[in-house]
Amino acid sequence: MINGTGPMHPASPLTTAVFSLGLVLTAGLGPAHAAGEALLLIEADSGKVLKAENATYPWYPASVTKLMTAYVTLSAVKEGRITLDSPITVSPNAAAQQPTKMGFKTGTVVTVDNALKMMLVRSANDIAVVLAEGVAGSVDRFADEMNRASARLGMTQSNWVNPNGLPADDQVTSARDMAILARALLVEFPEYNGYWNIHAIKLGKRIIRNTNSLLVRYPGADGMKTGYICASGFNVVASATRGNRRLVAVVLGASSSAVRAAKAAYMFETAFNSNGLNWLMPSSGTVYGLQPINAAPPNLHEAMCGKQRRRPAAEAADEDEATGSDEQGLASVFSGAKGYGPK
């Protein structure tokens, strides 16, 4: 049995922070890579765009792919094809996936509910395949379902070939598409909001903490998923709520997990304090109106994992594990920021 938990420790002063762009750039976290980043902030209820920068450039999704895996899985539950209690089995193919993973042996049986928790908290690549095979019978058939769902949602820049986001040239998305997906999850499946906000899971005596540091460091953060491979840089799709207003932020291609979290938090904080006005974008419309750019996705492998990087990140390792001391860098951003009280 896997138990999901809320915060693992009381809120500290680090969790009440305001971000400034200057602070992020001077916190010793390293400059943004030459290819830039993709940034997008929308209102979850309306889809209104509050900020967009490179939001329609194609990008490698890495583990934010798992949000689409969750969407297809929850759709199958809604359709009655499976239930959250349905048993699914770890196949040899699932067990052979690269880290990050749970590492279960072939033949291990888990429920759909527990598999979703492990995939979303641990970012377990093996469990994403377990879900795919359990829902559709094979990874290829599940990828077909992912692509059909993308087409139905209007995610015109996305193509999926696997359920976990491990490196694949043909697996692409954009900040626009990921914001559309995040909004669909929140609007279509409000009863499953708890999946995006699990701070940690307990497996036996083992405590596994969520890779999304915003959940315990930014007040009001309540989802959703991080991602990293060398080609993509550090990605996050995040949500946060203050009062009755919920926002979705997408950051693709950040130079570290610390920068990724800080930029998402900065967008949240700026928007929450803007009295509902668009931030520097008075006529940006909704996320569905953003025009896709026809281009190849940037490949950040050299910038993220090349020899010139002081601490090259590992290709197969996911999230904060890939950067070792990035969490210390993130702490320096928070500790240097001004405090504020909830609105």
Model-predicted segments: where are they?
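Domain-terminus/edge residues, biased toward the C-terminal soluble/receptor-binding domains
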Residues: 155-159, 163, 167-172, 176-343
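Bacterial N-terminal signal peptides that target proteins for export
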Residues: 3-18
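A general, composition-driven signal for non-globular sequence regions
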Residues: 7, 25-27, 60, 254-257
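Secondary-structure junction/capping motif
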Residues: 10-14, 111, 138, 256, ...
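Bacterial N-terminal signal peptides
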Residues: 16-28
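Hydrophobic alpha-helical transmembrane segments of integral membrane proteins
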Residues: 13-15, 63, 220
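Active-site-adjacent loops and short helices of periplasmic peptidoglycan-processing enzymes
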Residues: 26-176, 186
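Hydrophobic alpha-helical context, especially transmembrane and signal-peptide helices
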Residues: 11-13, 34, 38, 98, ...
